Each structure stands twice: as structure tokens, then as C-alpha cells.
């Protein structure tokens, strides 16, 4: 490797908004990285995930055009 072109790779402390800290290595010179969420407080990892069904595009599409598969299946069974 060429000398003088690579950044320094230093031990870095990552500090989460929830108070969790852990050590890693980074090229950031301050030695500290502040983050908003981590694996200890993120809802996906903690299991406290909320599923929000706001009835977006799919619901508007079905309201506008109806469920075509349901109508087609009913016609086929009536013909048989």
C-alpha cells in the first residue's frame, strides 16, 4: 500500500440517544459518533414494532377499480 494516502483508522465510541454506547473503529478523527437509534432501542430489533395501515394507494386503487380477481373468479364458477 502507498503511504500517506490512507486515512487513520482509530478506535471510536458510538453513543446512541438512548444512552447505549459501544466501541468500533472508524476514520472519523474525533473518536466519537452520535446516533439517534441503535439495535438496543430501534423498534425493529426490540420487537415493539407498530404496523401502520393507513389505507394508502392499494386501498384507493381497490375502491376505484374494485377487486377484478374476485369478479373474474365469480364468472368462471358460474359458467361451470
Swiss-Prot record:
Binding positions (Zn(2+)): 16, 18, 38, 41
GO cellular component terms given for this protein: ribonucleoprotein complex; ribosome
Essential cofactor(s): Zn(2+)
Organism field: Rhodococcus jostii (strain RHA1)
PROSITE patterns assigned to the protein according to its UniProt record, in alphabetical order: RIBOSOMAL_L31
Keywords, in A-Z order: Metal-binding, Ribonucleoprotein, Ribosomal protein, RNA-binding, rRNA-binding, Zinc
Superkingdom as given in the UniProt entry: Bacteria
NCBIfam families to which the protein is assigned, alphabetical: L31, PRK00019.1, PRK00528.1
Self-association state and partner proteins as the record states: Part of the 50S ribosomal subunit.
Function: Binds the 23S rRNA.
GO MF terms held by the record: metal ion binding; rRNA binding; structural constituent of ribosome
Protein name: Large ribosomal subunit protein bL31
Cofactor note: Binds 1 zinc ion per subunit.
Family designation: Belongs to the bacterial ribosomal protein bL31 family. Type A subfamily.
Any GO BP: translation
